[in-house]
Curated annotation (Swiss-Prot):
Alphabetically ordered keywords of this record: Ribonucleoprotein, Ribosomal protein, RNA-binding, rRNA-binding
Protein name (database record): Large ribosomal subunit protein uL11
Superkingdom field: Archaea
Record Pfam families: Ribosomal_L11, Ribosomal_L11_N
Amino acid sequence: MAETVEVLVPGGRATAGPPLGPALGPLGINVKAVVDDINKKTAEFNGMSVPVTVMVDDKKNVTLTVGIPPTTALVMKEAGVEKGSGTPNTQAVGNLPLEAVIRIAKMKMESMLSYDLKTAAKEVMGTCVSVGVTVEGKTAKQAIAAVNAGEWDEQLA
């Protein structure tokens, strides 16, 4: 029977320590080789937490599945901030151009409940509310209202 281990690791910086080592060690596989493979596959997400699923079958074959980081991590990376605002409704810590919102929406589209780019972009803008990041200089709520009013229909088509 195959064993599955799901962990959240720092992109490009996974180690054989917790949470990976203790979970993979008892499975009798080369933990260092798996960690090196994870680091190669997550290098582009450097500094972000990345969900990784490691599946080990009965013959000790390892299959890695690397997910996409949480939307908050992508928003903060694009905005160039380390930490979200402690008071997101009153104090903004960064600003995203619409292009960055669209890029994140396209990345996350598969795992979102949205059927089109416009609603996916509004979901990303909703995340901006909780992090304290503005969109095109507007609060995320104002940006969502602008999308609803059709202000950015051309870019979101």
